[in-house]
Amino acid sequence: MFQSNQYDEYNKTNKSDEENESNENENENENENENRSEDGDQDSEDSFIYEEDDEEEEDTPKLSFGAKFLAKHGHIEGQGLGKEKDGRIDLIEVDRFQSTKGLGFAENDLPEFYRVTKHILEDEDVDFPSKQRFEWISCNSEGYNFWEGFPVDHTLVKFVANDSITDKPRRGHCSVELLMELDQHKNALDTLDPNRFYVARKKSNPYESIKGSIFINRAAVKMANIDKLADLLTPIIPVPGKPRDFIYFGDVCAGPGGFTEYVYWKKTRGGKIKGEEGLDLDDVVKGFGFTIKGQCDWNVEKFSKQIPIHNFVKEYGLDDTGNILKSENIRDFSSKVFYNTNGFGLQLFLADGGINTDGKESLQELMLQQLILCQILTMFETIGRGGNFVCKIFDTFTPFTIGLLYLVYQHFQSFSIVKPFTSRPLNSERYIICKNFLSYRPMNIIDFLHYINSLLNNNQTILELIEINSMDPNFLRYILESNELICLRQIKAFSLFKKYVEDIELPPIDQKEIRAKCLEEWGLPKETKYDIENYQKHKNRQKHHHNNHSNNNNNNNNSNNNNNNNNQHQHQHHQHQHHQNQHQNQYQHQNQHKKYNNNINNNSNNSSPNSSPNLTSSPNLNSPPNINNGNNHQNNNNNNSNNNNNNNNNNNNNNNNNNNNNNNNNNNKNRRFISTKLVKNNSQFQQKPPPPHRHMSPLQIQQQFLLQQQKEQQLLQQPQKDQLHQLHQQQSQSALPDFSAANFMEALLKRKNDSQQ
């Protein structure tokens, strides 16, 4: 695609450089003239030598870097390159616009019809409208009633030999001068370089940048242009039992399916079926396709993804080849259409058939005669009353083509021939558009056309179907005016094309503005097909990522809630065990206190009066506890070990949850179009378990010692009964073999004396 901005910038830079050079030359000339006028009165030798030096400098050209490099290596100007000095002498020209050809590419000379010259675009060359006008004609006489009683008579058909085909039949329905001028342009294309042809065609066609818009090919945009002119998708007679806007349509010889894609796109409003509740695609549109298998087959997979097309029916005829030139395939397709439409027929029939005629453009109309006949025959076989018809044709100069068009003209209420803007202006392509079919399966016409088709399949060449003199003068006048109008437009397009062939630096027309206006006029989006598909893919990826991200968040939140619940349950269990241990210790302490009271009472009865209550000593922290206290400590240690195990299990669960979260985060990081706001680690949302049991620190020991001293002071302040209880407790402890180190020797001596006595 050629952008006008690049050429505008290039021309601006060239113009600015040329203006700067011209200004510099003028300044230099003025300075030299001033110097010479000032020094003209002086006839000194210095001034004379200075002028001679200037002349010598002007005569000796400046050498370029390449010339200096070659001269340095012994190259002499005027001799060829290489060891034998028989190589290239001229410099290699740099082609800025055809850089893909490579250096040294020798382009073919232009044909005699073209000359390399510089051109300027005029106002007529740039005037290209976006709104198109055309003319309808109607048949005054009820021709379809005439053909209902018309017998098939092969005597009306004129035959000619195959070797006597000439272009003389063309001269009857167009100006000879226009045809001769048009033939000159077409014949010059035979010897034109293909690359130069394609470049000039793109630059000279102002509607080239429209291309296929959002559809599979240009045919869909042509259909959009035609539909804007004629409103063909609105049914004239509604189908019984269907909504008012529902249509049956047929698409013949239209692979890969541009017409079909547009019809489904337009009827479904861009892929969005709107209407009453429960409205299905079968209540909006249904299509039947017939095309030849192979390279021209349907390519439904490349249709726009947002367009529903699941009810489209593809047929290939009785022999499963899709060859429409065979009458048995046409009858098979017709029977299936009427079976699926309950005998109602099609409300829209589209035909876009064509063949390759490269190098044989002058014989294009003769080569397409049978194909056009079979498309019109299939239309008569399948279309219902009130249906519309669109068919692609080319030149309409021969009596055979004009006879076919006359049959169509007499069976429709409105008839027209249109060359849409989206059709390339250089070719002779055009479309016949017909509205409101006035008959229903005219069997005489159908049988007559089947008979003609059988003759063509037997290599019979037919010159004329209906005598020209018997046709409607209004129809013949319209054919003549249509041919001349299209010829004039073709000649105008070829004149602009010739300028771009002769001047490769001529900038193209601003195609962006024309494209935007045409798409707005035809009701098509300005974005391309790939832009919409890429946007839809990106949107689906974001939606898919959002769902995965929300699922991951839900899973993480659920796991966090489960972990928190587990931790809370475990913490509650730990507290419950701790309370149970405290209750057990209190219960054991109460029992022990009761025993002590009983012992004190017994000892008080048996004690001597000389005993003193001041014999009590402060408790020793290094003394071992009693047996009951040892059991209590064992229970506490067991409980602490259980709590440690529970805490370890909690930590393991937390580690597993953290690993799961890390895996989820890693999976999210590997995704495309991922949001940076990922779920944080679950560990910061978890409730921390209680700290495990540890050995007492020195500070804790000191605090416990102070607490015990306070308890001792409280005991000293108790009554005598409590002091006796403490004395009895010390005496019971002295019976044990384990004493403090300070009184150990004294206790041994006392026991020894007691044993001796």
UniProtKB/Swiss-Prot annotation:
Residues 1-61, 538-670 are annotated as: Disordered. InterPro entries: G_patch_dom, mRNA_Cap_2O-Ribose_MeTrfase, RNA_MeTrfase_FtsJ_dom, RrmJ-type_MeTrfase, SAM-dependent_MTases_sf. One of its GO terms (biological process) is 7-methylguanosine mRNA capping. It catalyses: a 5'-end (N(7)-methyl 5'-triphosphoguanosine)-ribonucleoside in mRNA + S-adenosyl-L-methionine = a 5'-end (N(7)-methyl 5'-triphosphoguanosine)-(2'-O-methyl-ribonucleoside) in mRNA + S-adenosyl-L-homocysteine + H(+). Residues 214-438 form the RrmJ-type SAM-dependent 2'-O-MTase domain. Keywords: Methyltransferase, mRNA capping, mRNA processing, S-adenosyl-L-methionine, Transferase. It holds the Pfam family G-patch. Residues 538-548, 570-581 have a biased composition (Basic residues). Residues 549-569, 597-668 have a biased composition (Low complexity). Its EC number is 2.1.1.57. S-adenosyl-L-methionine binds at residues 257, 301, 352. S-adenosyl-L-methionine-dependent methyltransferase that mediates mRNA cap1 2'-O-ribose methylation to the 5'-cap structure of mRNAs. Methylates the ribose of the first nucleotide of a m(7)GpppG-capped mRNA to produce m(7)GpppNmp (cap1). Cap1 modification is linked to higher levels of translation. This is Cap-specific mRNA (nucleoside-2'-O-)-methyltransferase 1.
